[in-house]
Amino acid sequence: LMRAIAGAHPPHAGRVKLDGTDITSLPAHTRVRRGIALVPEGRRLFAGLTVEENLRVAAASRTGGRWNVQAVLEVFPFLKPRLHMPAATLSGGEQQAVAIGRGLMTNPRLLLLDEASLGLAPVAVDAVYRSLADVIREGMTVLLVEQDLGRALKVADRVVCMLEGRVVLEGEARSLDRDRIVNAYFGLRRAAAGGTGA
């Protein structure tokens, strides 16, 4: 889903629309210019480049806006002492912060964030999610794919639970709880497998 929205993968069916405009046929680089930034699972930084260089790479695709290196460092202050260090020397949480910062450097209207907590120590996840909450409070639209339901529910306004390309539950985050989401996802999966699910 995320890669289809970003233009990195063609959708199998349907259309991709941004503000009511069909962008399905637009290449990924054009979608970036239109305001879509993807922070993929696995971070995918340039290991030999410094933190600052990794951030500035994304600035080439930048549209006008608030996000620059200084603004990213305000949201992720733990990156300041690492600014001139190679990305390969960073912890997983620091790398994830750089990846999110790189997405922000394009000044997107829509930030696609795939599995922000994957493979991170709990303390790193805490730091990333504190900063992500700040980004959202500033008005950034974030589409977050996350298996850590507790954390996702704390930052989300709206939740859409999908299974095999179909929406199985959606609603305002404050009206949904973990059990309801888990039941929708796993209950439907058990039913599809011939079990006694919901």
Question: Where is each model-derived feature located?
Answer:
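Glycine-rich phosphate-binding loops of nucleotide-dependent enzymes
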Residues: 1-198
